[in-house]
Amino acid sequence: MQSVPFFNTIMTYHEILKTYWGYDNFRGIQEDIIRSIGSGHDTLGLMPTGGGKSITFQVPALAKEGICIVITPLIALMKDQVRNLRERGIKALAIYSGMTREEIVVALENCIFGDFKFLYISPERLGTEIFQTKLRRMNVSMICVDESHCISQWGYDFRPAYLQISEIRKMLPGVPVLALTATATPEVVEDIRRQLGFKEDSRTYQMSFERKNLAYIIRPTEDKEEELLHILRKTEGSAIVYTRNRRRTREVTELLTQQGITATFYHAGLNNDVKDQRQKSWIENEHRVMVATNAFGMGIDKPDVRIVIHMDMPDSPEAYFQEAGRAGRDGQKAFAVLLFGKRDKTTLDKRISDTFPEKDYIRDVYEHINYYFQMAMGDGLGCTFAFDLDEFCRNFKHFPVQADSALKILTRAGYLEYTDEQDNTSRLIFTLHRDELYRLQEYDADTEKLINVILRSYTGLFTDYANISEDTLAVRTGLTRQQVYDTLIMLTRRRILHYIPGRKTPYIIYTRERMEKDWIVLSREVYEDRRESYAKRIKAMTDYATDEETCRSRMLLHYFGEKDIADCGQCDVCVKKRKERASKPAPSLTLKERVIALLSQTPYPAIEVAKKLDADREEVDELLASLISEEIIRTNEGILSI
């Protein structure tokens, strides 16, 4: 394993790329972005899914002294990138919702004293006192804002926590910011620059979102399951099938399996070990099809996906473009197919009312949350609770979809912080020094075996928390999972290590003290403007699915602000037009065109022209007289020529 040279001033960007990633050259606009942020300019990079965004901040950060702060809402992605960086010998760590205060303190101290190059952090952690206190002591080289469209209230995935980034900028006024996104309309681009406080010398780089190898197809059907089977039988290669909910992932997987198509499913409700195993089996082509909710796909490295099929309509062109774009990253021919039925438009329209329930309903949900947690008036500020949405809805007679939406709106309004399910892996750190650990002679055989297996299986256990798997430790030690758990709890009580069992639960944090529900203010910016923007995206998605005259690729690119784009020639609309042109008989030539064509080949006697063309003699004579007078043809003793 390589270690990162301290302060890589002697390494060029290309040397860093070659040393740690093995590539000789950058792709597309990667180098432009790297040189811009490396020179200290605030920079915005717009790159399509699969465009290599991570390289644009990882390479310049390695060329600078200090640590790069990477802000991202995607916990699974930050864990994956931290793991990949560590495998390359690059010191990186992550702080996200669900970590204990002790874990966070250890991580932040490592950022100050441990020569780490990257700190990945979720936006919700930016406003905490402990982070801001420690941040002032860090040597920060640059800030990277991933998924930067989340800072814009006009974006399809606005997250209020992103607005705290502007406060971080005030604390680090000389530190440049790199904002990255794969989906942003022109309106959102301007909002990103404004919200992040970009300086006058800032720069923006944009790759075209056009995917020349990807054919977009709308398939109208009232029997989506049968159409899905038909498509998968007619095509070859790895596939992703997106469904709207978790239940459907299982149902579709069972259907495909029954029909002899190898498939597995994935959604946020599965535990990490199951997710990892299924993802691995799909990547290694043990299963041809991954059936998933939109929880799947971010950061997945599988370039040979040949087809992405949507069983249900996404909420926006942004979401569809990102998910469809997971096909054909290897540059080979690929397909993105959306199955569209008559009922889909009605379903989309209903999503508006489900996503933005009435304000009085939202206030009722707030009051019921307080009852659920038995929160007294004026109390609650800073309190965190594990939360079971299904139980809450059963107790207070709510529909889960609407209650979930109400809680998200209350989060945007600043009254609560509600997160979906967090699947946090078990972690541990040794609290004794390595020498002290070996001096202790009071372990039984099973405990000693477990400690030795842990030390052989994981690294960095004396300086940072490491993710562990009780199942893996059970296999390697020959103990049961329960024995592993009990032993780790015992070692924690004896202060030999600190073990945090994995847990999987959503949670709610009170960001303000409890108040009367009638005092809840849902501003136009939080509610009406967001609802209107959401409705526009729904309409844009419906227009995309129902327009039978405009090239699909051109429609998507136009939505993202790219003008004067040629038809792709491969979507269902373009193919249909090409077939229609091919099926039409060649238009018949006019009599004038036939006369000129005849005389262009050879001079001809005037009296023979009508007979040769099998045309009316009178009509031909009249036409010949006109062409002679216009000097289009010449006559010489009754012989006509051009």
What is each residue range found by the language model?
Residues 3-20, 24, 28, 32-54, ...:
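Helicase motor core with emphasis on the C-terminal RecA-like subdomain
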